[in-house]
Amino acid sequence: MPSVTLKSENLESEGPILEVHFLIPSELEKKYIEEKKPIPEPVIIKSLIDTGASACVIQKEIPEKLGLEPMGVTKINTPSSKEHECYQYFIRMVIPSHNLIYEGAFIAAPLEGQNISCLIGRDVLKSGILIYIGYANQFTLSLL
């Protein structure tokens, strides 16, 4: 099971943050290659592992930069709003240095006033292991 272990001097205040790359889905990439279309460059962002988020959330600019169309609409609840409608996108998320890959649905919603552009939620964590060692300012994420 591929995993990534990171240390952070500010783990308590910032949380478990890691750099991830967003790419078009692998099936779409195959289609682009067959059609000799240019493949969009990866969108590289900071992401927070959030056990309080039931699903992964990304800033809406990410799928726009990749030229993706929404696959549907879903409703989310946040601490400040209820049943807020948001687009869902099928995207590939990669942590290239550790060969961690997740391909699935991401909800596009505002993540303003933060130094992150993605929340990695329990829909990803259900396929992995998260170890948070607070006293060592360290966390490990493993994904199937």
Language-model features, listed with the residues they occupy:
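Pepsin/retropepsin-fold aspartyl endopeptidases
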Residues: 1-144
